[in-house]
C-alpha cells in the first residue's frame, strides 16, 4: 500500500477526528492522515483515545498514544468510559460507549475517521450471517455513514490487514497489542484467528468476495429504502412514533421492512426476525386494554393510542421529591430525566417568600387546571392530555409548599396561575 484511498467525502472535509486506540490499524490510519495533512495544510486533525479500563495495560496505552500524537503533532483527546452490564455483552457495550464518546467529542464541522479494513468487513459480514441477518445486516460497513449529525468515514475499508502490516513495518511505526485480541472466546477474534485463515488458505480472495456481497446487499437496501419511502411517510408521525393502522393492511414482508426502518431511524439495534415477530404479536396486537412493553437493552417498545413508541427505559419516580432550594437556578432531576428551570415570562406565578419549591411526580386529590371546568384527579388529566402511561410518573410536577402549580409542558393549576405580567415558565430539558 503506497497511498491511502481516502473516501471522497473526506477530501472535502478540513476537520478530522481520528479514532486512535494505538493498535496497528488506527496507527496506520493516523499516520496516513498525518501525511494527508502535510499535503493539505488547511486540514485540522485531532485524535481521540478511549480508555475502557478493561485491561491492566490501559494506562500505558494512553501514554503510548500521547507519545505518538506528540511526535506527529496531533492534538489528542483521552476519554475514560465506565462500562456497566446493560445486557448487551461486553463487546457490544464497549463499542456503544466508544461511539457515544466519539459523538460527544466531535466539534462542529468535524468528521470521524475510523480504521476498519477489508478483513474487519469480512468479519462483520460473517457475524451478521451467523445471526441470521438479512440484507441490512449483511451490508456490513459503509465507507461513509451518517453519524452524530456529521459523517463517519472508514478510509481503509478496501485495504487488507496484511497490507496495513506491511505499511507499518516499512515506515517503522510502533503500535500496541491488546492481549484481548488473542482471546478466541470472543466471536470476532475466533473468526480472525481461526476461521478466516483457513478460508483464505483455500480461497485467497475470500475477504474481497465477501466485501462485494456486502456492497450488493447495501445496494438492495438502498433500493428498498426508495421503494418504501412513501409508506414510511404514511406510517411515521411527527413525534417519531409508528402508526399501526397502515401496517395492519400490509403483507408480513412489507410490514417487517417498515418496522426495521422505523427502528433504524430511532437508532435502535437491528432486530432479528424473531424480535420483529414479537414486536408485532406481543405489542402491536396485544389486547386493547393492555399496556404492552417489550424490552431491548436499555430501551423498550410500547403501544399507546394505536402507535408504537421506542423509548428509553426510565424507572418510575412516583415516590421521589426533589427539593429546589434556589429556584432561580436550573435543577437536575434523578434517573437521567434532565433538568428543569423557571424562566421569566410565562403563566405561572412566582413562589412567595415563605413557600418552599420542589419537584415531585405524583399529586393526590382533585385538581383544578387552567382551561378546564370542574376538578379532576391527576390520572384523568393525564388521560385527557394524551400523556402515555410511562410518562405519567416521570413528568416533573412543580410544587410550592404542598400546592401543585404545574406539570412541565402539560398544564397549569388555578392555584399556580400568574395574576400579573411577572409570571414564569417551567422549562423541562429532558
From Swiss-Prot:
<dbReference type="InterPro" id="IPR014729">
    <property type="entry name" value="Rossmann-like_a/b/a_fold"/>
</dbReference>
<dbReference type="InterPro" id="IPR012795">
    <property type="entry name" value="tRNA_Ile_lys_synt_N"/>
</dbReference>
<keyword id="KW-0436">Ligase</keyword>
<dbReference type="GO" id="GO:0005524">
    <property type="term" value="F:ATP binding"/>
</dbReference>
<dbReference type="GO" id="GO:0005737">
    <property type="term" value="C:cytoplasm"/>
</dbReference>
<keyword id="KW-0547">Nucleotide-binding</keyword>
<keyword id="KW-0067">ATP-binding</keyword>
<dbReference type="InterPro" id="IPR012094">
    <property type="entry name" value="tRNA_Ile_lys_synt"/>
</dbReference>
<keyword id="KW-0963">Cytoplasm</keyword>
<protein>
    <recommendedName>
        <fullName>tRNA(Ile)-lysidine synthase</fullName>
        <ecNumber>6.3.4.19</ecNumber>
    </recommendedName>
</protein>
<comment type="function">
    <text>Ligates lysine onto the cytidine present at position 34 of the AUA codon-specific tRNA(Ile) that contains the anticodon CAU, in an ATP-dependent manner. Cytidine is converted to lysidine, thus changing the amino acid specificity of the tRNA from methionine to isoleucine.</text>
</comment>
<dbReference type="Pfam" id="PF01171">
    <property type="entry name" value="ATP_bind_3"/>
</dbReference>
<dbReference type="GO" id="GO:0006400">
    <property type="term" value="P:tRNA modification"/>
</dbReference>
<dbReference type="Pfam" id="PF11734">
    <property type="entry name" value="TilS_C"/>
</dbReference>
<dbReference type="Pfam" id="PF09179">
    <property type="entry name" value="TilS"/>
</dbReference>
<dbReference type="InterPro" id="IPR012796">
    <property type="entry name" value="Lysidine-tRNA-synth_C"/>
</dbReference>
<dbReference type="InterPro" id="IPR011063">
    <property type="entry name" value="TilS/TtcA_N"/>
</dbReference>
<keyword id="KW-0819">tRNA processing</keyword>
<feature type="binding site">
    <location>
        <begin position="21"/>
        <end position="26"/>
    </location>
    <ligand>
        <name>ATP</name>
    </ligand>
</feature>
<dbReference type="InterPro" id="IPR015262">
    <property type="entry name" value="tRNA_Ile_lys_synt_subst-bd"/>
</dbReference>
<comment type="similarity">
    <text>Belongs to the tRNA(Ile)-lysidine synthase family.</text>
</comment>
<dbReference type="GO" id="GO:0032267">
    <property type="term" value="F:tRNA(Ile)-lysidine synthase activity"/>
</dbReference>
Amino acid at each position: 500500500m503506497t497511498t491511502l484511498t481516502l473516501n471522497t467525502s473526506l477530501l472535502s472535509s478540513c476537520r478530522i477526528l481520528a479514532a486512535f486506540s494505538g493498535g496497528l490499524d488506527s496507527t496506520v490510519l493516523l499516520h496516513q492522515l498525518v501525511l494527508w495533512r502535510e499535503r493539505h495544510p488547511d486540514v485540522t486533525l485531532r485524535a481521540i483515545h478511549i480508555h475502557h479500563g478493561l485491561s491492566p495495560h490501559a494506562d500505558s496505552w494512553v501514554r503510548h498514544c500521547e507519545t505518538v500524537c506528540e511526535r506527529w503533532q496531533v492534538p489528542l483527546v483521552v476519554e475514560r468510559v465506565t462500562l456497566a452490564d446493560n445486557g448487551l455483552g461486553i463487546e457490544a457495550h464497549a463499542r456503544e460507549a466508544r461511539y457515544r464518546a466519539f459523538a460527544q467529542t466531535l466539534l462542529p464541522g468535524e468528521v470521524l475517521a475510523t480504521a476498519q479494513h477489508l478483513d474487519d468487513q469480512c468479519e462483520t459480514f460473517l457475524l451478521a450471517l451467523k445471526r441470521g441477518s438479512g440484507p441490512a445486516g449483511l451490508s456490513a460497513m459503509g465507507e461513509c455513514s451518517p453519524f452524530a449529525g456529521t459523517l463517519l468515514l472508514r478510509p481503509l475499508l478496501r485495504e487488507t490487514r496484511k497490507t496495513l502490516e506491511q505499511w507499518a513495518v516499512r515506515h517503522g511505526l510502533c503500535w500496541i497489542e491488546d492481549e484481548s485480541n488473542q482471546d478466541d472466546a470472543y466471536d470476532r477474534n475466533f473468526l480472525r484467528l481461526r476461521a478466516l485463515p483457513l478460508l483464505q488458505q483455500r480461497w485467497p480472495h475470500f475477504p474481497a468476495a465477501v466485501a462485494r456481497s456486502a456492497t450488493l446487499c447495501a445496494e438492495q437496501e438502498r433500493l428498498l429504502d426508495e421503494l418504501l419511502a412513501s409508506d414510511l411517510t404514511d406510517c411515521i408521525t411527527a413525534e417519531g412514533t409508528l402508526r399501526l393502522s397502515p401496517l395492519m393492511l400490509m403483507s408480513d414482508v412489507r410490514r417487517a421492512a417498515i418496522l426495521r426502518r422505523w427502528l433504524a431511524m430511532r437508532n435502535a439495534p437491528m432486530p432479528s426476525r424473531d424480535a420483529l415477530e414479537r414486536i408485532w404479536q406481543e405489542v402491536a396486537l396485544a389486547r386493547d386494554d393492555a399496556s404492552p412493553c417489550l424490552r431491548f437493552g436499555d430501551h423498550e417498545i410500547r403501544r399507546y393510542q394505536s402507535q408504537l413508541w421506542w423509548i428509553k427505559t426510565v424507572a418510575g419516580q412516583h415516590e421521589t421529591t426533589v427539593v429546589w432550594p434556589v429556584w432561580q437556578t436550573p435543577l437536575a432531576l434523578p434517573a437521567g430525566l434532565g433538568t428543569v428551570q423557571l424562566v421569566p415570562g410565562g403563566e405561572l406565578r412566582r413562589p412567595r417568600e415563605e413557600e418552599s419549591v420542589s419537584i415531585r411526580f405524583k399529586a393526590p386529590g382533585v385538581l383544578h387546571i387552567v382551561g378546564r371546568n370542574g376538578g379532576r384527579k391527576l390520572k384523568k388529566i393525564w388521560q385527557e392530555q394524551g400523556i402515555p402511561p410511562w410518562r405519567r410518573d416521570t413528568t416533573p410536577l412543580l410544587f410550592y409548599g404542598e400546592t401543585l402549580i404545574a406539570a412541565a409542558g402539560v398544564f397549569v393549576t388555578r392555584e399556580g396561575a400568574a395574576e400579573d405580567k411577572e409570571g414564569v415558565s417551567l422549562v423541562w430539558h429532558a
